Amino acid sequence: MKKIELLAMLGESKDIIDYLQRKGTVQVEKCDAPESMYYTDTDSSVSQLERLLQTAENARETISFYSPEKKKLTDSFLPRKEVELSDFYEESEKTDVAMAKCREIIDIKKEIADKKADIIREQTAREALIPWERLDIPPNTTGTRHTEVFVGSLPDECTEEALKAGFAAALPDLTALDCEVVSSSNTQSIIVVICLKKDSRRVYDYLRSLNFVRASGGDNENIKAAMERHGKNIEALSSDIDGDEEKIRELSSYREDIDFLIDFLTIRKDKYEAFKKMSLSRNVFYFEGYIPERYCEKTVKGLE
């Protein structure tokens, strides 16, 4: 490796840095700034480019996931395609469009994630209703003009026979009472108890002694209708996701433009990082670095 020092007019800095980047032979190192020269802070520009680069790479990964590129096994061993300088400048004019497509892809990806989360919520809500499936009245039913209806759950397994026997023992004078166990497991039993209005306080007190929890209020919708609603919501969300995934597959036509955008942003980021290591004055710029010896002569001639 040979050490290289370069002092040139500030107005030529862009062309010189572009040339060195294309050649990729010089490693710029930060050095002590000569007297009357200073360093410029490019951190904000680098950070902005890193965010843009992250967006582009995220979009590229999303395209690859939903629309994998068909390649031969040997393609990974081939060198990257070289781009003529004129073509590079022409393609660089399209980077704004490519970035807009990247943002569109990311937005669609977020919508897919949100809808998948909604599906999980709908499935959870539907599964929570399964123990109540045989209930043929809305869970928030409280009664009629003359009767009180208690719909809710007990914390343990319970049979209808045991429930009726418990009422008979605790409230033997009650004759106008009916109860049903809708479902029962070792963790929960769903029950319905119907009694006369005048007996409702005594019935409720007994149920509370069993740790009865009344069904919470809500829409006047029966369980079957609610389960069907959740099922339809899941189908609609799944259909929307299929449509969103197809949109991403259609946007895979911008794959090459996004690949170029990633390279373009990487070059710009590297340029600003290199520029941060260069000393500037009002009219000139200066930097030090290292270059492989075999490239010295050719690089110097190119710079001259």
Each language-model region and where it sits:
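Long, charged N-terminal accessory/stalk domains
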Residues: 1-304
